[in-house]
């Protein structure tokens, strides 16, 4: 028999979204891929520390539309940001690094692009937070490369760099590989 759930609350501060990213350490949800938001399609910050009473606390529109993101409480190699809440946005034509610790004043740390950009779709930190692995969803289709994974060196969040590219031996579109 199927289980039927009862609604605890209905949050109406945004319409559709591509994804909702949650940082369990901070108790915040980040809505990404939501065109038509007051933040130019950038992440929307929702306090879900009390899940039945979510609170809209702001957003980050400075770098434009974020299709996907990862948000972590940072304990990586860059000591300038230890303990800060860091958002890495896959923003269609670049990767954005932002400090979102202060929800009323998010700050761009840096951003980085790469050659043959088609659609910066998603990415994920390595466990040690030294590297960020990116999938460009449409480069195989529009540029004609084999499936490409980009590995960025994030040892210094102010100065990220492309470490290397990995090409597989097929031409599959890499959608949500990480």
Regions found by a protein language model. Give the residues of each.
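Feature marking well-ordered beta-strand scaffolds used for ligand recognition
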Residues: 1-178
């Amino acid at each position: 028999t199927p289980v039927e759930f009862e609604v605890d609350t209905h949050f109406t501060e945004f319409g559709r979204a591509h994804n909702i990213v949650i940082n369990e350490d901070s108790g915040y949800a980040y809505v990404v891929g939501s065109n038509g938001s007051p933040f130019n399609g950038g992440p929307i910050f929702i306090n879900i520390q009390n899940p039945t009473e979510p609170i809209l606390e702001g957003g980050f529109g400075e770098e434009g539309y974020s299709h996907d993101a990862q948000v972590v409480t940072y304990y990586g190699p860059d000591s300038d940001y230890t303990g800060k809440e860091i958002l890495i946005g896959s923003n269609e034509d670049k990767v954005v690094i932002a400090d979102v610790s202060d929800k009323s004043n998010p700050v761009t740390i840096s951003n980085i692009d790469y050659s043959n950009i088609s659609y910066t779709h998603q990415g994920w930190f390595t466990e040690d937070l030294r590297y960020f692995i990116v999938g460009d969803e449409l480069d195989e289709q529009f540029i004609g490369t084999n499936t490409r994974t980009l590995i960025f060196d994030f040892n210094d969040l102010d100065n990220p760099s492309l470490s290397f590219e990995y090409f597989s031996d097929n031409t599959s579109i890499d959608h949500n590989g990480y």
